């Protein structure tokens, strides 16, 4: 986005961490739930 990488760097890291912290467990939980459903049936 911006060429300045002095104060924007921590914001990008925080946003990256928040996005991954929300996306990774969601995908993992969806996969686990779907696998459990298929195994039970």
Swiss-Prot record:
Keywords: Chloroplast, Electron transport, Heme, Iron, Membrane, Metal-binding, Photosynthesis, Photosystem II, Plastid, Thylakoid, Transmembrane, Transmembrane helix, Transport. Heme binds at residue 20. It holds the Pfam family Cytochrom_B559. NCBIfam families: cyt_b559_beta (TIGR01333). It is a single-pass membrane protein. One of its GO terms (biological process) is photosynthetic electron transport chain. The chain crosses the membrane at residues 16-32. With its partner (PsbE) binds heme. PSII binds additional chlorophylls, carotenoids and specific lipids. It comes from Mesostigma viride (Green alga). GO terms for cellular component: chloroplast thylakoid membrane; photosystem II reaction center. Coiled coil: none annotated. It comes from the Eukaryota. Heterodimer of an alpha subunit and a beta subunit. PSII is composed of 1 copy each of membrane proteins PsbA, PsbB, PsbC, PsbD, PsbE, PsbF, PsbH, PsbI, PsbJ, PsbK, PsbL, PsbM, PsbT, PsbX, PsbY, PsbZ, Psb30/Ycf12, at least 3 peripheral proteins of the oxygen-evolving complex and a large number of cofactors. It forms dimeric complexes. GO terms for molecular function: electron transfer activity; heme binding; iron ion binding. This b-type cytochrome is tightly associated with the reaction center of photosystem II (PSII). PSII is a light-driven water:plastoquinone oxidoreductase that uses light energy to abstract electrons from H(2)O, generating O(2) and a proton gradient subsequently used for ATP formation. It consists of a core antenna complex that captures photons, and an electron transfer chain that converts photonic excitation into a charge separation. Its main location: plastid. Disulfide bonds: none annotated. It is found in: Plastid, Chloroplast thylakoid membrane. Its cofactor is heme b. InterPro entries: PSII_cyt_b559_bsu, PSII_cyt_b559_CS, PSII_cyt_b559_N. This is Cytochrome b559 subunit beta. Belongs to the PsbE/PsbF family.
């Amino acid at each position: 986005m911006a060429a300045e990488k002095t104060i924007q760097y921590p914001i990008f890291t925080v946003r990256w961490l928040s996005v991954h912290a929300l996306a990774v467990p969601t995908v993992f939980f969806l996969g686990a739930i779907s696998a459990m459903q298929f195994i039970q049936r």
